[in-house]
């Protein structure tokens, strides 16, 4: 049982971290930046080797992340070295040091990590869509739950969803996607009834459901049901190009939902138990592996978006924090002062550690 959870968890996390760090590495090398180390994991090195460029590739004992250490980096977070630390570099090292490069090279190298995460998700979805296709159903209402938001809004069996808050819908899944993350929001629905469009408003409410992995999740619903007779479920098959286009669209939806969730979570409008850390991810990986490899790679795709999105938040020492400093540097035309950088990194690191502590607490005791 333990290995049945641990092995899938390590697979999922290692793939996501490797792709993220490979983004930093490849773009950094393309920009002419020297790389001292590429590490999967933290702590003591388990195995490793040096390549012909002098980069140390290694696997470390604590598999909860990874890093690329560029020439000039004084730690794994690529924080700005002090002037005294830069003086310890040789002239050759200064030429390829990360922090001596043009702003656009540093920004491109930093943003490449999250972008590679998004690309990984697109690749996974593309392969899944091309291999298995996708089942969809017409956006029809077969039943309306009594006393539900839909019933109070006047939605009736036989109605067809046309749009949700101005977004056109083509499938019942589109309706679920646009509603599921908006509990407590007043949403405008345009329905097609007897050949005429009818506009109604409803406020979704949270309902606890079980997802495909058996986890209890809370999603916003309005209380409508689709069925085979009205929904007419069908399998959509894709050409390779069509699969990529659908994957890009689906990845965009996942990114949008992730941002929407974090925004609502920050103001207390989401259940704290919906946010988990390594323990929850490990549990999900174990369950996904039991259902089949395609479920495991779907988890890779979803986690990859989450890691990419979180890293873009403008908080030092995350990638987004670095990008924020580069933006300020571009505006004021000089690097941010060492004192300001140090204060920002300390505050950001404290915030990140508090967040990590929160999700660990959720995993072990809170939920």
UniProtKB/Swiss-Prot annotation:
Entries under PROSITE patterns matching the protein: PDZ, ZINC_PROTEASE
BP term (GO), one: proteolysis
Protein's membrane topology: Multi-pass membrane protein
Keyword Hydrolase: yes
The keyword Oxidoreductase is assigned to this record: no
EC number: 3.4.24.-
Molecular functions (GO terms): metal ion binding; metalloendopeptidase activity
Binding site for Zn(2+): 20, 24
InterPro entries named among the record's database cross-references: PDZ (IPR001478), PDZ_6 (IPR041489), PDZ_sf (IPR036034), Pept_M50_Zn (IPR004387), Peptidase_M50 (IPR008915)
Keyword entries, A-Z: Cell inner membrane, Cell membrane, Hydrolase, Membrane, Metal-binding, Metalloprotease, Protease, Transmembrane, Transmembrane helix, Zinc
GO cellular component terms listed in the entry, alphabetical order: plasma membrane
SUPFAM superfamilies reported for this sequence: PDZ domain-like
Positions of the PDZ domain: 121-196
Transmembrane segments: 108-130, 291-313, 343-365
Family: Belongs to the peptidase M50B family.
The name this protein goes by in its record: Putative zinc metalloprotease mll0638
